[in-house]
């Protein structure tokens, strides 16, 4: 299964004999860790109201598992009535598929391994052998590259253009940066991919900028805090 972020999801297993689950319930695990749990009703449809919906349809009221929006599991004979009242109707299997896809995107940083990264390098090496040979492991060890890609994925930064990422790492190799610092430093090289996620090519993109002094203060705080995030002094007055 391919994820649009540029990695392949590991194989998935489906277990139907978990006696600890209630009827109609399902769980999603990453490794042995339960990361999500919800219910689907295979004999019903999930109806999600829109802004134009006025009539309330009878059914099992829930929040959809992916986005937490108010929804109703309705019986089949109410589908036409719901559609006429501007409900969006979703099949139960689509509910699970959307939830699973969201989990894969959210936990993609946990899913990618050194073997996965090596597979990505092998694939890229077919068209760019010299680039691979000059970067990994000469400039960046495989385990460091894995950390860098994990960091990007955790922040939902796509790694589709691995070639650009490696080229950026080549230019940064002399700066003796940690994997965390390299993760941040490669962002400008893939800025076009980041922008494409939030804006079409012909659209204007509204941005918010900080005062240069405040920005430098945040950068300094980030370096001091490390992997714990940015720790801002509560006494700070802007």
Spans of features found by a protein language model:
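Membrane-embedded alpha-helical signal segments
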Residues: 1-238
